[in-house]
């Protein structure tokens, strides 16, 4: 739904849709003031959930004093159908023994009473005592070599950067993706960077460092042709089991969309050796409904897809099967590439103390790396899997 410049107050919440510049065509986002996340009432939680589904992403201002326990409590309340898991189970969503991606990332967990999944997504020194984490320095890993077209370190130091990887939160195996996701921005670096697409398009975008990029998958759906909408409405995707283990050796495309076709996936015979339960492999509609607004979103994370089940219309009984990483990614790139442009991308938030919640079933987001010379980044990330099953025009989700 398009944002306007009007201001509305729902109960105690002041909800102000974002007003984007004349160079922007994106149609989502809102700011919220008048909400204390440490003391939110049940009515305010309900209003916040509705605002997130309606505006896709909300930035709650002035949350410098928010407590990690209250952060985790809010994440659970925003999805009453959440799926509780332990920290050990969290790692096992990505690899049966907790190895692989999660072990490689070495995520620091912010202590909470319930051992919630509030992870420290920062850079540099996190302080002498950050909620019980003592003198933690997250260092500076340079991600330039992750791309199939590497980013030169001297360019990176000079302020050039890239989108890292467009994705929705969740493992895409065993459990359903989180309904709503959370980033609390505690400390942010200063300066300016230029995100370069580096894909031959010549596109670029000025940003502040340490922020996160977002685009709307409902806006993407609206950009499709009638023929394309008829196809995606009736099609589905099957994700690889433990998909992040499958693509762990892959390099990313320089614009952050998908991974490069270089044959670097873990071989299928090696994947077959990984213990798994076929019941946990996820097949979802390409298009997901927003239960509040009834909007449709083209909600596909292409780098993790094993095969596509394509029906051009509701009358087509048997799907056309598209499989093989190169064919799948080429097909999805043609559908998704059009939204990855500066005018459709929001990068935020603006300042420290902002807490961002977004509708994970209707957005894609990407980290943007920066040099530590700009200063430390202290951010709390949180999400919880959902028992909700994504629904769309094609009822295939499991």
UniProtKB/Swiss-Prot annotation:
Keywords: Dioxygenase, Iron, Metal-binding, Oxidoreductase
Gene3D superfamilies found in the cross-reference section: Clavaminate synthase-like
Cofactors required: Fe(2+)
Domain of life: Eukaryota
Binding-site residues for 2-oxoglutarate, renumbered to this chain: 212, 377
Gene Ontology MF terms: dioxygenase activity; metal ion binding
Note describing how the cofactor binds: Binds 1 Fe(2+) ion per subunit.
Residues reported in the UniProt entry to bind Fe cation: 167, 169, 365
InterPro entries: TauD-like_sf, TauD/TfdA-like, TfdA_dioxygenase
Tagged with keyword Oxidoreductase: yes
EC supergroup of this enzyme: oxidoreductase
Metabolic or biological pathway, per its Swiss-Prot or TrEMBL entry: Mycotoxin biosynthesis
Family membership: Belongs to the TfdA dioxygenase family.
Function: Alpha-ketoglutarate dependent dioxygenase; part of the gene cluster that mediates the biosynthesis of the diterpene glucoside brassicicene C. In the first step of the brassicicene C biosynthesis, the bifunctional diterpene synthase bsc8 that possesses both prenyl transferase and terpene cyclase activity, converts isopentenyl diphosphate and dimethylallyl diphosphate into geranylgeranyl diphosphate (GGDP) that is further converted into fusicocca-2,10(14)-diene, the first precursor for brassicicene C.
Protein name in UniProt: Alpha-ketoglutarate-dependent dioxygenase bsc9
Source species of the chain: Alternaria brassicicola (Dark leaf spot agent)
């Amino acid at each position: 739904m398009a944002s306007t410049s009007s201001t509305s107050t729902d109960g105690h919440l002041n909800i102000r849709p974002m007003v984007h510049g004349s160079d922007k065509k994106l149609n989502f986002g809102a700011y919220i003031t008048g909400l204390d996340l440490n003391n939110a009432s049940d009515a305010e939680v309900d209003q916040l959930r509705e605002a997130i589904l309606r505006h896709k992403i909300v930035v709650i201002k002035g949350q410098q004093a928010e407590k990690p326990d209250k952060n985790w409590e809010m994440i659970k309340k925003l999805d009453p159908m959440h799926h509780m898991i332990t920290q050990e189970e969290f790692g096992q969503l990505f690899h049966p023994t907790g190895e692989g991606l999660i072990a490689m990332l070495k995520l620091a967990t912010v202590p909470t009473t319930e051992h919630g999944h509030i992870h420290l997504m920062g850079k540099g020194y996190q302080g002498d005592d950050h909620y019980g984490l003592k003198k933690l320095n997250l260092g500076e890993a340079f991600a330039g070599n992750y791309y199939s077209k590497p980013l030169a370190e001297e360019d990176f130091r000079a302020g050039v950067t890239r989108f890292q990887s467009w994705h929705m939160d969740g493992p895409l195996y065993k459990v359903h993706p989180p309904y709503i996701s959370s980033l609390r921005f505690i400390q942010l670096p200063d300066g300016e960077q230029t995100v370069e697409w580096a894909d031959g398009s010549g596109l670029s975008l000025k940003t502040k460092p340490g922020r996160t990029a977002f685009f709307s998958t409902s806006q993407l759906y609206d950009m499709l042709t009638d023929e394309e909408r008829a196809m995606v409405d009736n099609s589905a995707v099957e994700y690889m089991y433990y998909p992040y283990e499958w693509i762990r050796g892959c390099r990313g495309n320089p614009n952050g969309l998908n991974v490069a076709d270089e044959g670097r996936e873990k071989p299928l015979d090696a994947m077959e050796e990984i213990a798994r339960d076929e019941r946990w492999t996820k097949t979802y509609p390409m298009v997901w409904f927003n239960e509040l607004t009834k909007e449709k979103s083209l909600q596909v994370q292409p780098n993790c897809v094993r095969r596509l089940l394509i029906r051009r219309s509701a009358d087509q009984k048997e799907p056309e099967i598209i499989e093989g990483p190169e064919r799948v990614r080429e097909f999805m790139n043609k559908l998704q590439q059009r939204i990855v442009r500066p005018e459709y991308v929001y990068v935020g938030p603006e300042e420290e103390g902002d807490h961002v919640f977004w509708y994970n079933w209707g957005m894609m987001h990407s980290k943007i790396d920066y040099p530590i010379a700009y200063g430390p980044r202290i951010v709390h990330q949180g999400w919880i899997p959902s028992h909700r099953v994504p629904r769309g025009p094609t009822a295939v989700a499991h």
